[in-house]
Amino acid sequence: MQNYKYDKAIVPESKNGGSPALNNNPRRSGSKRVLLICLDLFCLFMAGLPFLIIETSTIKPYHRGFYCNDESIKYPLKTGETINDAVLCAVGIVIAILAIITGEFYRIYYLKKSRSTIQNPYVAALYKQVGCFLFGCAISQSFTDIAKVSIGRLRPHFLSVCNPDFSQINCSEGYIQNYRCRGDDSKVQEARKSFFSGHASFSMYTMLYLVLYLQARFTWRGARLLRPLLQFTLIMMAFYTGLSRVSDHKHHPSDVLAGFAQGALVACCIVFFVSDLFKTKTTLSLPAPAIRKEILSPVDIIDRNNHHNMM
């Protein structure tokens, strides 16, 4: 009986899960890899395009009115900030990227775990994880700026910056829409961008993303409480950043809460639906060859039994 090997039945082009062009033509495979990288960069650019347009153009926020007796917008303007934009970006981005670099290098060097079309495992790991993180940053900032210019909520220090001429305003009308600000126009436009807090959304996104990254990559069991301590510290940093905006008279408490919710939502969506941090690795296995059993008729079975009995 002929010994049939299942491996011979596999079409050569289907081995290694690819076509002959990908398996035997490295030039075409390399061009496809470059095309995919360019597509990823294009998607990253498009995700951050609303943020870039709003920040670099003269788009003005929605012109919202106010009530003369609204105490929530009568706070004085503070000259300094507890956490300015430079510190926020430096801490949020630098800490997250350094943690990702450390985690991926440890994972590849010590655990020998890396699967990617990019040949260098270190470059491949950083490309995937840092790319996903920056993609989420772009989405979060675009969401924030779109909300700011669309809603135009007045900051707590709006009247201090606007300095309207109340002698020309009839407060008995209730909601005042027709008014003119005598303050600096750039500061007035910035004072119309209260909802929602960009500091709260950005800090929550970066820190929660890092918390989830530690949950997926920090596998050392030596210190049971070390990982929860690090995660708690990161979340508290995000909370402090958002709450400082209330004490600085930059945002209302509801602005900060909305920013926290938006940053957390984007972080969870990026981690669970875009990145592969919590995705189980599945391998495609070919089915085992079927075992052919010899089928005998009842007469052949009787003859075979008689043959054994005679022996």
Swiss-Prot record:
Q: Where is this motif: Dityrosine basolateral targeting motif?
A: 109-110
**Where in the sequence does glycosylation occur per the annotation?**
N170
| Active site (record annotation) | H199, H251
Q: Which residues cross the membrane?
A: 34-54, 86-106, 123-143, 194-214, 226-243, 258-278
Provide the positions where the record notes the PTM Phosphoserine: S19
Cellular component aspect of the GO annotation: adherens junction; basolateral plasma membrane; endoplasmic reticulum exit site; endoplasmic reticulum membrane; endoplasmic reticulum-Golgi intermediate compartment membrane; Golgi apparatus; Golgi membrane; membrane
The stated induction of this gene product is: By EGF, VEGF, FGF2 and phorbol myristate acetate (PMA).
- Give a yes or no for keyword Chloroplast in this entry: no
As for membrane topology, the entry says: Multi-pass membrane protein
Localization per Swiss-Prot or TrEMBL: Cell membrane; Basolateral cell membrane; Endoplasmic reticulum membrane; Endoplasmic reticulum-Golgi intermediate compartment membrane
Location of the region described as Mediates interaction with CTNND1 in the Swiss-Prot/TrEMBL record: 275-311
Report the family membership.
Answer: Belongs to the PA-phosphatase related phosphoesterase family.
This chain's function reads: Magnesium-independent phospholipid phosphatase of the plasma membrane that catalyzes the dephosphorylation of a variety of glycerolipid and sphingolipid phosphate esters including phosphatidate/PA, lysophosphatidate/LPA, diacylglycerol pyrophosphate/DGPP, sphingosine 1-phosphate/S1P and ceramide 1-phosphate/C1P. Also acts on N-oleoyl ethanolamine phosphate/N-(9Z-octadecenoyl)-ethanolamine phosphate, a potential physiological compound.
- In its UniProt entry, what is this protein called? Phospholipid phosphatase 3
What is the scientific name of the source organism? Answer: Homo sapiens (Human)
Encoding gene per record: PLPP3
